């Protein structure tokens, strides 16, 4: 049985309580269609060791497998997209590392089971790189990284374009959650109304999804 705390001291200092798996699943069942949409994005602002994100990834990967298991390149493309749709922030460095590791293991277990020795190192490297970008050591309250000095949290948006090309755009977290911007304009509108569209702080040219680990300076 999984524990809900790592240590009493961590609860006192950081309010850390881990969500039990049965509660995670019950909560995700409330938004089941979104958890099964491969490109639907999720952010966990206090991700801990990744219980929510892993459960979402496992659901997405089941969809990817059902649709694309007969084609390795198609499976790889959409499995990478599924991983790239998940974001997390945690104030504790060991949680961040464990969350990245567990997400990678969830991906790799499914990938290896399907393709065995045909699994590509490039695909694994792409997933590791994306997880380093998407799971951030930071403070969701201050909207900054836990570094010296702190820096604004940046998130990378990943989108498939023209088949196997992956487009990256970086956004400042504080812009995405700006109360003034959110009050002035909604994020989405089905009535053709003007909406709030955040501006990226950096826009990158598309690259093949298997090349992302070596396509950027970071």
Give the ranges of each region predicted by the language model.
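SAM-dependent methyltransferase catalytic region
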Residues: 2-218
């Amino acid at each position: 049985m999984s524990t809900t705390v790592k240590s009493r001291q961590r609860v006192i200092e950081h309010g850390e309580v881990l969500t039990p798996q049965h509660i995670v699943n019950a909560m995700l069942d409330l938004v089941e269609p979104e958890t099964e949409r491969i490109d639907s994005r999720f952010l966990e602002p206090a991700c801990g060791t990744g219980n929510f994100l892993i459960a979402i990834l496992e659901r997405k990967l089941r969809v990817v497998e059902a649709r694309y298991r007969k084609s390795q390149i198609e499976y790889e493309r959409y499995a990478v997209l599924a991983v790239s749709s998940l974001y997390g922030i945690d104030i504790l460095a060991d949680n961040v590392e464990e969350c990245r590791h567990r997400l990678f293991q969830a991906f790799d277990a499914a990938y290896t089971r399907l393709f065995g020795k045909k699994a590509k190192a490039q695909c694994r490297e792409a997933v590791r790189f994306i997880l380093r970008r998407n799971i951030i050591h930071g403070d969701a309250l201050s909207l900054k990284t836990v570094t010296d000095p702190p820096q604004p949290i940046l998130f990378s948006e990943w989108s498939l374009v023209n088949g196997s090309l992956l487009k990256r755009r970086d956004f400042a977290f504080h812009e995405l959650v700006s109360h003034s911007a959110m009050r002035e304009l909604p994020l989405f509108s089905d009535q053709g109304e003007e909406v709030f569209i955040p501006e990226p702080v950096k826009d990158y040219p598309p690259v093949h999804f298997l090349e992302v680990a070596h396509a950027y300076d970071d």
